[in-house]
Amino acid sequence: MAGHSKWANIKHRKAAQDAQRGKIFTKLIRELVTAAKLGGGDTSSNPRLRAAVDKALSNNMTRDTINRAIDRGVGGGDDTNMETKVYEGYGPGGTAVMVECLSDNANRTISQVRPSFTKCGGNLGTEGSVGYLFSKKGLILIASADEDALTEAAIEAGADDIQPQEDGSFEIYTAWEDLGSVRDGIEAAGFKVENAEVTMIPSTTVQLDAETAPKLLDLINRLEDCDDVQNVYHNGEISDEVAALL
């Protein structure tokens, strides 16, 4: 996992405005319902559901809301047939972009995704065109901790790698299926988890300049505004110097 310690620069997040928060919650609930419907309501035997629960909690969703969504999925109270689809393409500056969608209408979804690429100087690729550049991983963020103690706890919990960041925080990587159990182990050792989610880690990154970086951020914003888009992953990297100019 060496070379990916600047995850805060690699993955862009929009500000938590009220309208955006509502859209995020809608997408989280959709994933909770679908995960429970496909794999059952027990998070210990359904890693996709556990990952969805962890992400919902990290976004401050209440347990009551989470449980209601799971009950909808398990109880069959939602007849919508949602399917996961991943679109791959190229963004500004030759960046690789993966768009994870959850939709009941593939035609509607592609009609939202394709124009986003086109308007930002990118293009939608074929299946497998950039997917080989990414690995599916669990990512746990710790704001601050004693490095030796955290490393020991992370290894004991089954983590694959731990990377200290310049701001004193730590990024812990796991097999995506083990995200829940590793998080539990780290918390049991007394550490506070700031965020835990399943993500896609790029094997190589593309350094963006002051002209290209805003175009990629615009593409990400457009894609995340699409109702059917759950997650956007890319391998663009923005230096602190370029970020200061944006």
Swiss-Prot record:
It is found in: Cytoplasm. Keywords: Cytoplasm, DNA-binding, Transcription, Transcription regulation. GO terms for cellular component: cytosol. It comes from the Bacteria. GO terms for molecular function: DNA binding. GO terms for biological process: regulation of DNA-templated transcription. Belongs to the TACO1 family. This is Probable transcriptional regulatory protein HAPS_0943. It comes from Glaesserella parasuis serovar 5 (strain SH0165) (Haemophilus parasuis).
